[in-house]
Swiss-Prot record:
One of its GO terms (cellular component) is periplasmic space. Keywords: Lyase, Periplasm, Signal. This is Alginate lyase. Disulfide bonds: none annotated. Its EC number is 4.2.2.3. Optimum temperature is 42 degrees Celsius. Pfam families: Alginate_lyase (PF05426). Residues 1-28 form the signal peptide.
């Protein structure tokens, strides 16, 4: 039977709409970069010496903490030993959780012991059920702790969620509890760090955007992904023609250190965006590459920064290998020079809990070095 002519366009339109809907649905699921799908290395059985450390008490109080730069001038470049100790003490349970989740997830992805998975999930569900870190009472240091903790946990969780070993297949209730909590925290982080004046947007905002990007992929929320990309673009447009970040240059003797500290979240966001078909490398004429090149040059010759802001640079932090974990995503986005690759290989593996653990395992697994550095990173 011949289809009436009037109906043909309708059927064609339906077919087109159907194919568009399928394509949209197929591309809608957010994913991390390729290495996050790595399987568990070896499912170990039998005797073991793993024991899950006590879960720190969920932090449900107001997020008001002293700054380690308390009493410093606007440069925020001079540490206050007394207030730093008070800060470390007040935030100990939060950082213990961050480090614990990262470490145990790394151990589980290596050994595959059920006890390790139980431990990691129990840490996160315990805090989730307590509505930890959700306080609307906070100061700058407090909201900073919230976004750091979220980024640490959600990026470690990605290793579990996307592994081709599917460790969460039989833990869907735990996954739901954790992801619902991450989602709530991300909404608050977006609120905490939105609509700041440009002079107030610095590495803290970049780290906030990273925590939201990791959570976007963990919870498959496009709105969070879009916010992180938007914040990245603001950051990229702060990079000047010479590769400097004016707001980080204000940090005087710590300017180079803070330029380096700005790179991990930005490189990770760009890498995650790339995995989802969004190429951020051209933003502001290749700002990320310009920033990375400037920092690498500055590490070799700190006088570049000293000449720019008149301060001899404090290189203490830059002697710690995990501070260069950004080289993993960076060298996946760009073709790094042989000397940069050599330096990267010397410093590997890069394990830093604020980026979810072992980035070498994700980005450059052929240069992984077992459990070396499991307790390192910041």
């Amino acid at each position: 039977m011949q289809t009436p002519k009037l109906i043909r366009p309708t059927l064609l339109s339906m077919a087109i709409l159907s194919s568009m809907a399928w394509a949209t649905g197929a591309s809608a699921a957010l994913v991390p970069p390729k290495g996050y799908d790595a399987p568990i290395e070896k499912m170990k059985t039998g005797d073991h010496n793993f024991s899950c450390e006590a879960i720190p008490k969920p932090y449900t109080d107001k997020l008001v903490f002293r700054s380690k730069y308390e009493g410093s001038d606007k440069a925020r470049a001079t540490l206050n030993a007394v207030s730093e100790e008070a800060f470390r003490d007040a935030t100990k349970d939060i950082t213990t959780l961050e480090r614990g989740v990262s470490k145990v997830v790394m151990q589980y992805m290596r050994d595959g012991r059920p006890e390790q998975l139980d431990c990691a999930l129990n840490m996160m569900t315990t805090w989730a059920k307590a509505d930890a870190l959700e306080s609307r009472e906070f100061n700058h240091t407090g909201k900073s702790m919230r976004k750091w903790a979220l980024g640490s946990m959600s990026s470690a969780y990605l290793r579990l969620k996307f592994s081709e070993s599917h460790p969460l297949a039989n833990r869907q209730q735990d996954a739901k509890i954790i992801e619902t909590w991450f989602s709530k925290l991300a909404d608050q982080v977006v609120s905490d760090w939105s609509n700041l004046p440009l002079e107030k947007i610095n590495n803290h905002s970049y780290w906030a955007a990273w925590s939201v990007m990791a959570t976007a992929v963990a919870t498959n929320r496009q709105d969070l992904f879009d916010w992180a990309v938007k914040e990245y673009k603001v950051a990229a447009n702060q990079v000047d023609k010479d590769g400097f970040l004016p707001n980080e240059m204000k940090r005087r003797q710590r300017a180079l250190s803070y330029h380096n500290y700005a790179l991990p979240p930005l490189a990770m966001i760009a890498s995650f965006a790339q995995a989802n078909g969004v190429d951020l490398r051209p933003e502001n004429n290749g700002a990320l590459k310009r920033l990375g090149d400037r920092v690498l040059a500055g590490v070799k010759d700190p006088s570049i920064f000293a000449e720019h802001n008149g301060e001899k640079q404090d290189m203490t932090d830059l002697k710690k290998d995990p501070k260069f974990a950004w080289l993993e995503p960076y060298c996946s986005l760009y073709t790094c020079s042989p000397d940069v690759l050599e330096e990267k290989h010397e410093k590997q593996p890069f394990k830093t809990f604020r980026l979810g653990g072992d980035l070498t395992k994700v980005y450059d697994p052929t240069h992984e070095k077992g459990d070396k550095g499991d307790n390192d990173g910041s």
